[in-house]
Amino acid sequence: MAEKQKHDGRVKIGHYVLGDTLGVGTFGKVKIGEHQLTGHKVAVKILNRQKIRSLDVVGKIKREIQNLKLFRHPHIIKLYQVISTPTDFFMVMEYVSGGELFDYICKHGRVEEVEARRLFQQILSAVDYCHRHMVVHRDLKPENVLLDAQMNAKIADFGLSNMMSDGEFLRTSCGSPNYAAPEVISGRLYAGPEVDIWSCGVILYALLCGTLPFDDEHVPTLFKKIRGGVFYIPEYLNRSIATLLMHMLQVDPLKRATIKDIREHEWFKQDLPSYLFPEDPSYDANVIDDEAVKEVCEKFECTESEVMNSLYSGDPQDQLAVAYHLIIDNRRIMNQASEFYLASSPPTGSFMDDMAMHIPPGLKPHPERMPPLIADSPKARCPLDALNTTKPKSLAVKKAKWHLGIRSQSKPYDIMAEVYRAMKQLDFEWKVVNAYHLRVRRKNPVTGNYVKMSLQLYLVDNRSYLLDFKSIDDEVVEQRSGSSTPQRSCSAAGLHRPRSSVDSSTAENHSLSGSLTGSLTGSTLSSASPRLGSHTMDFFEMCASLITALAR
């Protein structure tokens, strides 16, 4: 359990220093946070334990949040981490800079039909994703739809919604009255998904009209309007949109549109990106994915047999089964999203810029990685050799490239934080070339010679990074820019997924405790020139010790 600390007069929780308040919700504040090591900005939602206890959800909230951390959808705010203190939960979430859809509509008025449809398609895709994984929002509103820098929608605040079970009715009345369905404000029983559909209808109306379909300062009058389901449809809305709105804002939940109905509506289907509702015909629910099972074991600290028992039980609400299907679905939707943007010329500033295609400063694509976007999409999927017309064609199967290093799908700043922790543990000395490139040395206690190597983090593909190990010989001088071309690479052990946390006392001092004051080239670092064979063995021993430390 973490403790709150003070950092330069500001509150620090874990590695995050809290800053200004972004908003205030039912259960507490949302503040901007900055990672102390990387400077990465996050949104930190502070949930007061006492307020949560009053709702009688403390017992299940941790388990629910564990699954919410697995949610990966391009239009849902990501939950990275949950930090607990005796008084609060701190939910560390993705930060987007565009603000709320509510503020955007207030400032600019109604949105053009094409843009409104694009945003609504993104919102419905996110809601469908959550419903398929047994989670309902129950408080959808423009204030909970955030916009990124490229005007893409991202839904926030799925954190406190109940896990939805078949046949289970939700009695809790929550949400804002203007967006709440008639059955919610009337205190009647409701199952869950249908109240989100109503709220989506209100959001669509707000996008197209710049106002709310049901609004009144007098709450009893507002409730009467909602129960009656009568709202004004402006003349500029075409008949197709009007029929969709009336179907979504149907008072009787049994007659209300479902997500399937909306997806089949002619207006909704126009210009619908394929990645929003991916279908993978190769996916067979009867085949168990071993990699997904292992990931569930890692996330929940359970055994493979426990996961298999959950899958064979046939209970779709089982937490391990939900997590397994989340992982499968995440892989499918991200693969299709990537293919969609590779197969067509992407719009300027697409969400892929924020997702897979964004390369932080100092982080380079791997030299042997195909460029992510090439003008002609069919060629973009060709092997590298097919693009090299000077290289003779071979009928033999091309061997996979091997690298001495570690591949990971963790965030680049998390990978580097783990590297700093391991190097400090091993008493390595290092110099920072840039945020993702280090020059490292270790003294051989027997010979007294220094062994040197370069650590460079590369972007390998849309989801993977390679921490490349390169030997630095006394005769090799790297460029001042810090760029290093990988030498002929050796085999890597396997996939390593760094832990999400780093010891704070270690991480806070990494930039000072291990840094070198001098250059890592020339005779400054070595009192004697090592023999080539000895240097190579020392280099491999250095690599092995670092890999072992990272695996702990």
Curated annotation (Swiss-Prot):
Region (AIS): 291-376
Keyword Cytoplasm: yes
Stretches with biased composition (Polar residues): 480-490, 501-510
Swiss-Prot/TrEMBL induction comment: By AMP.
SMART domains hit by this protein: S_TKc (SM00220)
Record entry for activity regulation: Activated by phosphorylation on Thr-172. Binding of AMP to non-catalytic gamma subunit (PRKAG1, PRKAG2 or PRKAG3) results in allosteric activation, inducing phosphorylation on Thr-172. AMP-binding to gamma subunit also sustains activity by preventing dephosphorylation of Thr-172. ADP also stimulates Thr-172 phosphorylation, without stimulating already phosphorylated AMPK. ATP promotes dephosphorylation of Thr-172, rendering the enzyme inactive. Under physiological conditions AMPK mainly exists in its inactive form in complex with ATP, which is much more abundant than AMP.
EC number: 2.7.11.1, 2.7.11.31
Cellular localization per UniProt: Cytoplasm; Nucleus
Single GO MF annotation: [hydroxymethylglutaryl-CoA reductase (NADPH)] kinase activity
Domain Protein kinase, chain residue ranges per copy: 16-268
Pfam families (alphabetical): AdenylateSensor, AMPK_alpha_AID, Pkinase
Keyword Transcription regulation applies: yes
Free-text description of this protein's post-translational modifications in UniProt: Ubiquitinated. Phosphorylated at Thr-172 by STK11/LKB1 in complex with STE20-related adapter-alpha (STRADA) pseudo kinase and CAB39. Also phosphorylated at Thr-172 by CAMKK2; triggered by a rise in intracellular calcium ions, without detectable changes in the AMP/ATP ratio. CAMKK1 can also phosphorylate Thr-172, but at much lower level. Dephosphorylated by protein phosphatase 2A and 2C (PP2A and PP2C). Phosphorylated by ULK1; leading to negatively regulate AMPK activity and suggesting the existence of a regulatory feedback loop between ULK1 and AMPK.
Organism domain of life: Eukaryota
SUPFAM superfamilies: KA1-like, Protein kinase-like (PK-like)
Subunit and partners: AMPK is a heterotrimer of an alpha catalytic subunit (PRKAA1 or PRKAA2), a beta (PRKAB1 or PRKAB2) and a gamma non-catalytic subunits (PRKAG1, PRKAG2 or PRKAG3). Interacts with FNIP1 and FNIP2. Associates with internalized INSR complexes on Golgi/endosomal membranes; PRKAA2/AMPK2 together with ATIC and HACD3/PTPLAD1 is proposed to be part of a signaling network regulating INSR autophosphorylation and endocytosis. Interacts with DUSP29. Interacts with ARF6. The phosphorylated form at Thr-172 mediated by CamKK2 interacts with ACSS2.
Family: Belongs to the protein kinase superfamily. CAMK Ser/Thr protein kinase family. SNF1 subfamily.
Record's protein name: 5'-AMP-activated protein kinase catalytic subunit alpha-2
Species classification: Eukaryota, Metazoa, Chordata, Craniata, Vertebrata
